[in-house]
């Protein structure tokens, strides 16, 4: 893979796409920021939890992007193969294995949260779950499309169907005017 791909940058760009394209995300992100501010003032490990969450998002982006490229090549070599939701199950397993230790460390800190801060932490969970849902799917799609640039005749119809499915599934346009990822 080319050096130009930087996992943290791409996860930040996906978050920017969500901010501009997904009506639900703005409220979730605002609640997350407010919860983080409250948690920071009352819980000393908040910044470490946030860093773990950012690290997980970056790994999700990197792994999904790479898997998208691999799936594109696999599709190129086996054009009768159909892209399906099963790709995401495989991807989720890969991500789970790679982020397991980070999640374990984060959970150790979360267990230290005083009961009075659990309601504030719920907004952190909602934000994290939102990213866990959107980032791998979008990054996989971008990897799949990026794989078309590897000097072969891409099947643009498959990419179009993938984009249409993803747009319907996530409720956003992955190649919209605010998207600087492709």
PLM-predicted stretches and their roles:
Residues 1-177:
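Intrinsic-disorder/low-complexity detector
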Residues 181-182:
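Hydrophobic/aromatic hotspots within intrinsically disordered, low-complexity regions
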């Amino acid at each position: 893979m080319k050096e130009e791909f930087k996992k943290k940058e791409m996860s930040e760009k996906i978050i920017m796409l969500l901010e501009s394209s997904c009506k639900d995300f703005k409220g979730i992100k605002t609640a997350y920021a407010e919860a983080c501010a409250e948690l920071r003032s009352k819980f000393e490990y908040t910044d470490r939890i946030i860093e773990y969450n950012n690290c997980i998002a970056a790994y999700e982006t990197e792994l999904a992007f790479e898997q998208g490229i691999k799936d594109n090549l696999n599709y190129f070599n086996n054009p009768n193969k159909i892209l399906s939701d099963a790709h995401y199950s495989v991807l989720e397993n890969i991500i789970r294995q790679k982020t397991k230790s980070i999640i374990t460390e984060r959970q150790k800190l979360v267990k230290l949260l005083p009961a009075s801060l659990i309601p504030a932490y719920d907004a952190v969970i909602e934000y994290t779950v939102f990213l866990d849902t959107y980032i791998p799917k979008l990054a996989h799609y971008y990897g799949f499309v990026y794989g078309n640039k590897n000097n072969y005749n891409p099947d643009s119809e498959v990419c179009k169907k993938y984009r249409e499915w993803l747009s319907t599934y996530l409720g956003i346009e992955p190649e919209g005017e605010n998207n600087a990822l492709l």
